[in-house]
């Protein structure tokens, strides 16, 4: 019962390679959660051995550029090539479109409105798009229920619950649904 590792281990539980570096990642960053999204995209690009170029929303250029600088500097201190993290500093729609269609761009991570996500999907490059949504969280039967409730409340309240990644709905594994509901009621009493 519960979560199983499917597709991660092979015969005799030997690890199988499941990915390889792709090249340059185009990271399109919104204004609604600019720093956390920039950090997340930089980390997943670098952890997967890819370079990343961020294209910030015009109203968040300064904070995204500073976040990219801080992340790049921290990485360089640990041996990251200095050009592995880049950020467009004069953001405009044309720059984002050029980045998405550039011959060196291998994959696009687009976070923003539906128009931006559609543009990423129609760029001719592999793209992962995230737009506005009703974000669910799944609590599995083996979870520490008290910790799960604390984490859900923390995530829901982060940045006043305004980011598209904030938990908006909870889906509970049937065996723990009642206990989860009771813990939530207990934790949210004023």
Per-segment meaning from a language model:
Residues 1-14, 186-190:
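Single conserved hydrophobic/aromatic residue that forms the stacking wall/gate
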Residues 15-17, 86-105:
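A structured beta-alpha segment of the ubiquitous adenosine-cofactor-binding alpha/beta core
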Residues 17-73, 78, 114, 123-127, ...:
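Conserved small-residue-rich beta-alpha loop and adjacent elements
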Residues 36, 54, 86-89, 109-112, ...:
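General beta-strand structural signal in soluble alpha/beta enzymes
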Residues 39, 44-47, 117-189:
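ALDH superfamily catalytic-core signature
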Residues 90-94, 114-116, 134:
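Short acidic loop-to-helix transition motifs that present clustered carboxylates
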Residues 96-107, 113-118, 122, 150:
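Active-site/ligand-binding-proximal alpha/beta "capping" segment
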